[in-house]
């Protein structure tokens, strides 16, 4: 290693090499306001029952009175058989689950031995070891291609036929797209009149509108990328490249008006959808996400939409509040010097847990977390700074209220670090916290009427439905590090970039018998957990239904599973050292390398559409970049406008002002004026001004996942 390489290696461990290392972004007043909001609900007002009875009068308890049940009356099931059989049935099922868990561990051990001594032997084993030694994607790609050549996977790429996509349609469409694109380019090059060019361009646009759709003809089926270590079918790659060229031809066509181009790209964007990076929870296992993000960033495939839950929310906040240049300097082992949430000793933890029921101090975590969020930055401010859309999943402390996905649309003025804390507030580890909102004067105030929130992983670790609702996301890239889920990850037919080597990719991991037993045991475990939940037999430690940490969906179209080691469980609530973080960065990058080509092909079309959409959008200047543009003007949400209109300081003084406002505001104002006298309306506005201000903060909150769709499902049935 020469001197420049040694210097670079030393820099990545030097804390002074990362930007803003010594800077404290948060204002002490913000922490003080947060502490007041936390303690506000804990104080009891001193109220006497009457003038003759003292405050807090001691009353002897009636020993014969029945104890109040932990659950409310509506939750507690009744019936003789339920009361008698509940606990025996619960113990029997838990005993059977324990037996299944032991059998599952033996099955996985058998599969590991089978793959080690049967599947991986000889030269392919040495090639695989060489593959996993690579820390750079280009070198990894060369090693992957060498392994594909040895296994004969290159011949598989050259054969168009495959059961998991419609190769006949794709082959025919590639020829049509190429012919239409060539005709348009030839006519534009020869200077043909617009009457001749426009019909050819319309034909090309019609072809694009018919094929630019999510997973059209199965070209985005993960199975197409699960038969080789690098790449996919040559026909699929040719189709993706041709679609990108056709989109660029339409975008550069001077005979088509900008308005028509905008509507065309808007249509393509709606049909094709968006890509999002979803970072799971998992305590300190979440630091593997840093490596995943670094691999995507270095290869130019980091999505603009990012969501995080629990520990993943901290990583997502760092990514969404920094530019690409800042991230390249931050995602290094030296970042471990800024991760100081668990620096206290064991004695402090035990004393705090005994006093408060939580292992960590909320204010300390808020101070440390604020550095990753650039102080009291809001979701809207982060979007305006970097162009990335941050989403954080939070669960209300009330077990029956729906979850929330906080982002710049649903809660634009919510402070990011408060949402990250709420998403990481696991019962027993961190007490539920209050979300904070930034007011116009820069001070902080409680959000959502002071309700408290806790760990989002308990119910919505990967909020796919909410992402689809808000941002049309239909291609989630999930980085999954939850330790209780990683233990059960097993792809019997291979995964993206990791094919089954047994019988040249057409076999089963561990043989058919091993894969069949593994699938049966895993499905049986899932079945009994669902039985316990639906029969309401599970107890609720710490007032929380814990069944969802097993039964929710934890995967996406692409799921990245960083490989953990046993020592990670020992350090699950400890700050990483630079050496441990360096290993986690390396493992995270290596786990993402097999997915890079699949993500590149997806974003190749998506970015071409977005580029044309932003270039010809009437609301955005063509010179503005998506990452560097801000939002000028007022929000266009009709609900926000209606609530703003009802505030006393926003009322129009004359008809001209009323006509300048949106049509929705005019209709609401005119309707209200017909229903109420003017004096009553003024009195009502004065008395409810504070309520409308709070409602305005909460106006765009949309709730997430199963609770959102439960009512619709009932209506359909």
Curated annotation (Swiss-Prot):
Residues 277-468 form the PNPLA domain. Residues 660-673 have a biased composition (Low complexity). Residues 639-658 have a biased composition (Basic and acidic residues). Its main location: membrane. A motif (GXSXG) lies at residues 308-312. It is found in: Membrane. The keyword Transmembrane helix applies. The keyword Membrane applies. Keywords: Hydrolase, Lipid degradation, Lipid metabolism, Membrane, Transmembrane, Transmembrane helix. GO terms for biological process: cellular detoxification; lipid catabolic process; triglyceride mobilization. This is Patatin-like phospholipase domain-containing protein AO090003000839.
């Amino acid at each position: 290693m020469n001197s420049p390489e040694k210097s670079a290696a030393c820099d990545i461990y030097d804390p002074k090499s990362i930007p803003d290392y010594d800077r404290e972004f948060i204002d002490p007043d913000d922490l003080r306001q947060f502490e007041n909001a936390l303690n506000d609900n804990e104080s009891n007002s001193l109220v006497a029952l009457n003038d003759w009875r003292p405050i807090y009068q001691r009353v002897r308890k009636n020993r014969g009175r029945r104890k109040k049940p932990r659950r409310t009356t509506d939750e507690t099931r009744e019936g003789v058989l339920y009361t008698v059989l509940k606990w025996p049935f619960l113990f029997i099922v838990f005993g059977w689950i324990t037996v299944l868990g032991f059998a599952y561990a033996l099955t996985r051990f058998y599969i590991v031995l089978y793959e080690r001594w049967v599947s991986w032997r000889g030269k392919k084993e040495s090639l695989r070891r060489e593959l996993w030694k690579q820390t750079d994607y280009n070198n990894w790609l060369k090693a992957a291609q060498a392994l594909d050549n040895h296994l004969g996977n290159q011949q598989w790429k050259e054969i168009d036929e495959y059961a998991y996509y419609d190769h006949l349609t794709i082959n025919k469409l590639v020829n049509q797209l190429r012919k239409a694109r060539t005709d348009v380019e030839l006519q534009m090059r020869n200077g043909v009149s617009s009457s001749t060019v426009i019909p050819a361009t319309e034909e090309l646009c019609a072809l694009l509108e018919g094929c630019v759709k999510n997973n059209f003809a199965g070209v985005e089926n993960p199975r197409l990328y699960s038969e080789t270590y690098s790449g996919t079918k040559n026909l699929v790659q040719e189709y993706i490249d041709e679609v990108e060229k056709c989109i660029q031809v339409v975008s550069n066509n001077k005979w088509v008006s900008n308005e028509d181009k905008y509507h065309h790209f808007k249509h393509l964007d709606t049909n094709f959808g968006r890509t999002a990076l979803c970072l799971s929870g998992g305590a300190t296992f979440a630091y593997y996400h840093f490596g995943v993000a670094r691999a995507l960033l270095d290869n130019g495939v980091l999505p603009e939409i990012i969501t995080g839950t629990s520990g993943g929310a901290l990583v997502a906040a760092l990514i969404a509040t920094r530019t690409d240049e800042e991230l390249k300097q931050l995602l290094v082992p030296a970042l471990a010097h800024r991760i100081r949430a668990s620096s206290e000793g064991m004695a402090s933890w035990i004393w705090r847990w005994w006093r408060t029921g939580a292992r960590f101090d909320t204010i300390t975590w808020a101070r440390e977390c604020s550095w990753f969020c650039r102080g009291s930055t809001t979701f809207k401010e982060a979007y305006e700074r970097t162009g990335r859309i941050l989403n954080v999943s939070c669960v209300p402390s009330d077990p029956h209220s729906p979850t929330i996905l906080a982002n710049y649309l649903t809660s634009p003025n919510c402070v990011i670090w408060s949402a990250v804390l709420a998403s990481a507030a696991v019962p027993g580890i961190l007490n539920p916290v209050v979300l904070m909102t930034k007011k116009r004067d820069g001070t902080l105030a409680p959000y959502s009427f002071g309700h408290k929130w806790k760990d989002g992983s308990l119910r919505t670790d990967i909020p796919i439905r909410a992402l689809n609702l808000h941002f049309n996301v239909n291609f989630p890239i999930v980085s999954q590090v939850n330790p209780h889920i990683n233990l059960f990850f097993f792809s019997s037919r291979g995964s993206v970039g990791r094919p089954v080597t047994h019988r040249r990719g057409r076999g089963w991991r561990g043989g058919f018998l091993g894969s069949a037993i593994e699938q049966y045991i895993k499905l049986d475990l899932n079945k009994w957990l669902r039985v316990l939940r639906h029969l309401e037999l599970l107890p609720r430690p710490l007032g929380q239904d814990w069944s969802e940490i097993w039964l929710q969906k934890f995967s996406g179209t692409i799921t990245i599973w960083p490989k953990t080691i046993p020592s990670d469980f020992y350090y699950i609530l400890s700050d990483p050292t630079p050496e441990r973080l360096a290993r986690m960065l390396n493992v995270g990058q290596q786990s993402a390398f097999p997915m890079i080509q699949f993500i590149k092909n997806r974003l190749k079309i998506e970015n071409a559409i977005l580029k044309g959409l932003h270039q010809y959008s009437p609301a955005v200047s063509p010179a503005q970049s998506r990452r560097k543009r801000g939002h000028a003007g007022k929000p266009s949400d009709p609900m926000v406008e209606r609530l703003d209109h009802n505030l006393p300081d926003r009322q129009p003084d004359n008809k001209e002002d009323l006509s300048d406002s949106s049509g929705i505001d005019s209709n609401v104002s005119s309707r209200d004026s017909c229903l109420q006298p003017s004096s009553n309306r003024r009195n009502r506005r004065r008395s409810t001004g504070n309520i409308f201000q709070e409602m305005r903060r909460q106006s765009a909150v949309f709730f997430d996942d199963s609770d959102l769709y439960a009512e619709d499902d009932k209506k359909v049935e």
